[in-house]
């Protein structure tokens, strides 16, 4: 039996309004629990369009057929008009998710975090995280115990900033296994549960065809030597590719693969490490990557 952490990122208004209810129904039918990370502030995701001038981002948008994958409402959100606030407008959906799944903060403003947080000072970062946590806690009526940085934009500054919130764990980086990042003080920080497997948009049209993706991914899962964690997006697997996701769950069950919330992957003893800036094939720009203590 292979146990895989299932992380669901919710980046946009439509992903919350349309994708999350569909995913909740699918997961219920398959008796699966997951960790769902919500963006709760303004939906300004369309402002990423300026990145089309970067060849790597343009190629990603073309090979993943982004207009069909996400829809023009997502691709243009927050460009010619202020982005709609996601959280309170979809409070009932978020509360329903929290009844059955582990719920955490993805971001207050996903676009702002992904585009600008790398240049924020620590206090600006703390204020932004606090705003998102406060909003999500108002919606679900209980403390939020986990978070996942938007776009995996995380480094030592993010690790230090999140210590102020005493969360149970964060999932801010890519890597191989859960670990505790070392703080500037030399003490171990809040546990990190890295994503180990590629997302749909990172590999489609580059490493694998859409129709072959599920078999390709299951092969990666079964060969994973660490602690496998897979991320889906409400805007993708909850919308245009929900049938592919259902097929993945069916095939996974046949292969003895089970999915669980990320918190079930934690153990009492974890290795030490760091979150450093790095690059992942298929994704434009830097992102947080696990580095085991003592390695280079």
From Swiss-Prot:
InterPro entries: ArnD, Glyco_hydro/deAcase_b/a-brl, NODB_dom, Polysacc_deacetylase_ArnD. The keyword Hydrolase applies. It is an enzyme of class 3 (hydrolase). The keyword Manganese does not apply. Residues 2-260 form the NodB homology domain. Pathway: Glycolipid biosynthesis; 4-amino-4-deoxy-alpha-L-arabinose undecaprenyl phosphate biosynthesis; 4-amino-4-deoxy-alpha-L-arabinose undecaprenyl phosphate from UDP-4-deoxy-4-formamido-beta-L-arabinose and undecaprenyl phosphate: step 2/2; Bacterial outer membrane biogenesis; lipopolysaccharide biosynthesis. One of its GO terms (molecular function) is hydrolase activity, acting on carbon-nitrogen (but not peptide) bonds, in linear amides. HAMAP family: ArnD (MF_01870). The gene is arnD. Catalyzes the deformylation of 4-deoxy-4-formamido-L-arabinose-phosphoundecaprenol to 4-amino-4-deoxy-L-arabinose-phosphoundecaprenol. The modified arabinose is attached to lipid A and is required for resistance to polymyxin and cationic antimicrobial peptides. This is Probable 4-deoxy-4-formamido-L-arabinose-phosphoundecaprenol deformylase ArnD. Keywords: Antibiotic resistance, Hydrolase, Lipid A biosynthesis, Lipid biosynthesis, Lipid metabolism, Lipopolysaccharide biosynthesis. Its EC number is 3.5.1.n3. Belongs to the polysaccharide deacetylase family. ArnD deformylase subfamily. One of its GO terms (cellular component) is membrane.
């Amino acid at each position: 039996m292979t146990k895989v952490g299932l992380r669901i990122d919710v980046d946009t208004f439509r992903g919350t309004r349309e994708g999350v209810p569909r995913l909740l129904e699918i997961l219920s039918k398959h008796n699966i629990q997951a960790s769902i990370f919500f963006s709760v502030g303004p939906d300004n995701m369309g402002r990423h369009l300026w990145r089309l001038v970067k060849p790597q981002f343009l190629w990603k948008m073309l090979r993943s057929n982004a207009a069909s994958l996400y829809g023009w409402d997502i691709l243009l959100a927050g460009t010619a008009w202020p982005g709609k606030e996601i959280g309170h407008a979809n409070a009932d959906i978020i509360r329903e998710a929290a009844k059955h799944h582990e719920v955490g903060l993805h971001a207050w403003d996903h676009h702002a975090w992904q585009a600008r947080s790398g240049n924020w000072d620590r206090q600006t970062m703390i204020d932004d995280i606090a705003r998102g946590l406060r909003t999500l806690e108002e919606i679900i009526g209980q403390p939020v115990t986990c978070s996942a940085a938007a776009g995996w934009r995380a480094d030592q500054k993010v690790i230090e900033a999140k210590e102020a919130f005493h969360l149970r764990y964060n999932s801010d980086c890519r890597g191989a296994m859960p670990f505790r990042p070392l703080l500037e003080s030399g003490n171990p920080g809040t546990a990190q549960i890295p994503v180990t497997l590629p997302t749909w948009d990172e590999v489609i049209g580059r490493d694998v065809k859409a129709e072959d993706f599920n078999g390709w991914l299951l092969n990666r899962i079964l060969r994973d030597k660490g602690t496998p964690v897979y991320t889906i997006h409400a805007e993708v697997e909850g919308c245009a590719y929900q049938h592919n996701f259902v097929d993945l769950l069916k095939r996974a069950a046949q292969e003895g693969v089970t999915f669980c919330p990320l918190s079930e992957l934690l153990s009492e003893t974890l290795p030490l490490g760091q979150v450093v800036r790095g690059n992942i094939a298929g994704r434009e720009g830097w992102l947080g990557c696990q580095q085991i203590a003592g390695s280079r």
